[in-house]
Regions:
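Active-site-proximal, substrate-binding regions of enzyme catalytic domains
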Residues: 2-177, 187-280
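Short aromatic-hydrophobic micro-motifs that form the base-stacking/packing surface
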Residues: 180
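Short beta-strand/turn micro-motifs composed of small residues
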Residues: 183-185
Length: 280
């Protein structure tokens, strides 16, 4: 195990999921805009080479199943709807793709490949191994966190446990890791953090639920990684360097007095008056 600090950001399904109720493209697959926003933060802070993004296998599987189920529902609704209306200007035809689940699974795999080609390192966080089975069962039967809450009777609690156990098993091999777990589930947050810290005192985890919280921690990481080049998100582009130079007291002096090495200034003019009217 390396002693070098590692930085990891893990996503929960409820952060990345797409809504398929009012508008949807069932030809493609992608995470929602939140994923892009967080990746943009890593790029703006220039820490994309140090911070890795982990997508649990549970998340991939769950989101794939979500689009399959949404497609099955919407295609039936659409078929029923178009039977009620006929227009001479429009003709609706069907395409036989035989098996939508297999079709979309191949689309998901291509999306994974696209992410892997990007600047940011994207890793799939494996399901917990057989060695974690006993822990998973104990949580299930005893309703220990992250089981419980309003949805304790659904399979959601079980999926939450799989993700959490995946993170714990991952940290066993990365004991110096600094981890962000981005999830909309706020229940048992303190309990889970306490469990994590007792198991891995050299590692750290922040369980966060909002983009502004992610931004704050990523900025802290960026400052820790390189204090001298650290630039908070949003400040880098606040000031236009050209505008700053034009508005500085030295602008006129530098513009007039600059010697381009062509003709001595003294041979051209004895006195110069310069007034800046406007600039774009």
């Amino acid at each position: 195990m390396s002693n070098e600090k590692e930085y990891w950001l893990f996503f929960d399904t409820n952060v990345l999921f797409q809504l398929y109720d009012k508008k949807a493209d069932f030809n493609s697959f992608s995470f929602n805009s939140t994923f892009e926003n967080v990746c943009d933060m890593l790029s703006q802070l220039d820490i994309y080479e140090r911070v890795s993004v982990g997508i649990p296998k549970v998340v991939w599987n769950e989101m794939t199943q979500q689009i399959i189920e949404a497609h099955a529902t919407r295609v039936l609704e659409f078929g029923s709807y178009i039977k009620k209306w006929k227009f001479p200007e429009y003709r609706v035809t069907t395409c036989d793709i035989e098996d939508y689940p297999n079709y979309i699974k191949s689309v998901v795999e291509r999306y994974k490949e696209e992410l892997e080609k990007g600047l940011i390192k994207i890793t799939e966080l494996s399901l917990p191994s057989a060695s974690r089975f006993q822990s998973v069962m104990e949580r299930a039967f005893s309703k220990l966190p992250p089981f419980g809450g309003k949805e304790k009777n659904s399979d959601k609690g079980f999926k939450d446990v799989l993700i959490w156990e995946s993170i714990l098993e991952f940290t066993a091999q990365h004991e110096n890791a600094n981890i962000i777990f981005y999830t909309k589930d706020k229940g048992y947050k303190d309990v889970l953090v306490d469990e994590f810290e007792k198991l891995y005192p050299n590692a750290s985890i922040a369980i966060l639920s909002a983009e502004n919280e992610i931004k704050t921690v990523l900025e802290e990481w960026a400052k820790s990684i390189d204090e001298y080049s650290y630039q908070p998100i949003g400040e880098e582009n606040d000031v236009d360097p050209f505008a700053e130079w034009v508005e500085s007291p030295n602008f006129v002096v530098q513009l007039i007095d600059h010697d381009y090495g062509l003709i001595p200034q003294s041979a051209l003019v004895a006195e110069t008056i310069f007034k800046l009217v406007d600039y774009e």
